[in-house]
């Protein structure tokens, strides 16, 4: 959507992308593990990454509902742009917009709201799946 529709990502958008990337990396590594302790560690890292995503997406949704809390200058921009992936993959991980900029909704929700739903579902469903799998094996 960023390239096709010209929707510039803000610092909170980029932080949500980092959270999604971490969830994917930890999930793939955890899926490749055979040691129960290592699997548990990576399951925990997936949930922690999703909690970080909940924080970023939640604040983004709040900023979109109450744009007056935004000062017009995103103080996170230099921090997010200073992260290594912003230099390696600038199209994906470099800040170009403001967090309070409204974009047209997708199926009634903004992208930040969709991201929040996805992160919350991850936080709920991953531990639930872990619990169910461990109960089956016991």
Language model features by range: what are they?
Residues 4-11, 62, 105:
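Membrane-interface helix caps and helix-loop-helix hairpins in membrane proteins
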Residues 7-21:
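Loop-to-helix transition at the N-terminal end of transmembrane alpha-helices
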Residues 1-3, 52-67, 85:
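C-terminal TM-helix exit segments that contain a strictly Trp-centered aromatic cap at the helix terminus
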Residues 65-110:
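Extracytosolic (periplasmic/ER-lumenal) interhelical loops and adjacent juxtamembrane/interface segments
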Residues 33-54, 124:
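Interfacial segments of alpha-helical transmembrane regions
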Residues 1-8, 27-30, 90-91:
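Immediate flanking context of iron-sulfur cluster ligation sites
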Residues 94-138:
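A hydrophobic membrane-anchoring alpha-helix module
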Residues 23-26, 49-59, 121-125:
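Membrane-embedded alpha-helical transmembrane segments of multi-pass integral membrane proteins
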């Amino acid at each position: 959507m960023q390239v096709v529709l010209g929707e510039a990502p803000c610092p909170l958008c980029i932080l949500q992308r980092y959270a999604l990337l971490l969830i994917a990396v930890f999930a793939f590594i955890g899926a490749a593990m055979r040691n129960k302790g290592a699997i548990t560690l990576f399951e925990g890292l997936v949930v922690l990454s999703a909690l970080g995503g909940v924080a970023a997406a939640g604040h983004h949704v709040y900023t979109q509902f109450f744009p007056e809390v935004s000062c017009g200058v995103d103080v996170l921009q230099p921090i997010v742009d200073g992260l290594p992936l912003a230099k390696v993959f600038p199209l994906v991980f470099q800040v170009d917009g403001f967090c309070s900029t409204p974009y047209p909704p997708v199926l009634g929700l903004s992208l930040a709201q969709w991201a929040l739903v996805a992160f919350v579902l991850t936080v709920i469903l991953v531990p639930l799946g872990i619990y169910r799998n461990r109960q089956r094996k016991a």
